[in-house]
Amino acid sequence: MARRYDSKEAKRRILTACVRLFLEKGYTNTKVAEILKEADVSAGSFQNIFHTKDGVLTELISMMFSRQFGAVRPLAANAPSPVYLYAVETALQLAVTELSENLRDIYVEAYTFPATAEIIHRSTTAELQAAFSAYLPGCAECDFYEMELGTAGMMRGYMARRLSLIHISEPTRLLSIS
């Protein structure tokens, strides 16, 4: 008997399956066939909704980065400057990638794939502008976007290498740097 196609429900199942599989196996090691089996959807349904595995990652990154700074705001709520929010969020991303190879894989892919990287750039540009515009009053949004391109390149570089094996003896040191 053919499965009834409910795109919202299928999308939810695919996203749920991908979150679990990406965290368990990493982005690179998760195969589309595993996603289809876990989500109990057909290849056609998957392709109609997301087209590719990168399409799922784009959706997840969009959801995550729309909330990421908001989740960190309480940690920097009493800080004397909005710059602290940016510093805490940056340190948190680096620490998370040091603690989990599968999260490292997801973040590196997100900072590499053009569609997801653009989501990160746009989201972070707004945060950079909010944090640093008082210190850089002559900068326009495009200037903050260019700054984000540079910092994102550095972030990807640091995420792609296991820092604790190179220079850092404890991943928590990243949190104390900022």
List where the protein language model places each region.
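Hydrophobic alpha-helical connector segments
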Residues: 59, 70-103, 111, 121-123
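N-terminal intrinsically disordered/low-complexity leader segments
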Residues: 1-6
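Single conserved hydrophobic/aromatic residue that forms the stacking wall/gate
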Residues: 166-177
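Amphipathic alpha-helical packing segments from all-alpha helical-bundle domains
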Residues: 109-160
